[in-house]
Amino acid sequence: DLVPKIRGKVMPVGTYIAATEPLGENRARGLIRDNAAVADINFVLDYFRLSGDYRMLFGGRVSYSRRDPDNIAAAMGNSMVRVFPQLADARVTHAWGGFVAITVNRLPHLGRLSANCFFAHGFSGQGVALTGMAGKLIAEAVAGTAERFDVFGRIDHRRFPGGPWLRTPALVLAMAYY
């Protein structure tokens, strides 16, 4: 369990990804231009890219209830075909999931537990992009230059409503409405 200062300001959320069988270079290059990594702007976003062996890697879908879909491969395959209907015949060969930590405002939570104890969590699915920056800011602060780190420390991170027992059901209901 987390220390009281930060407990309740993050919540675990399941997120999932699937990989298709190799699609072949020509077919794969027709899906995503310049082999870009892509994410949409939906609140619960989809993200995708091609692997080195021309598989479609497609992620997204979340579980706020801490229950995984019964069949992750089928769930992610359906989401993928919604975005790429031309992949309806592509077989999903790998699928997996895990937890990320989200914050109420979906911004990473950086701060100090004491003068020399720093933390960074709650990257809300943006960890690949932002953890390197957070590590650099913490390193600067440890070395005595904390101005940039302190900018993030001033962001107001509210606790999830409902306390430890009701926050997950409350979020599930809110997302069902959304």
Feature-to-residue mapping (PLM):
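Active-site substrate-recognition segment that forms the wall
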Residues: 1-115
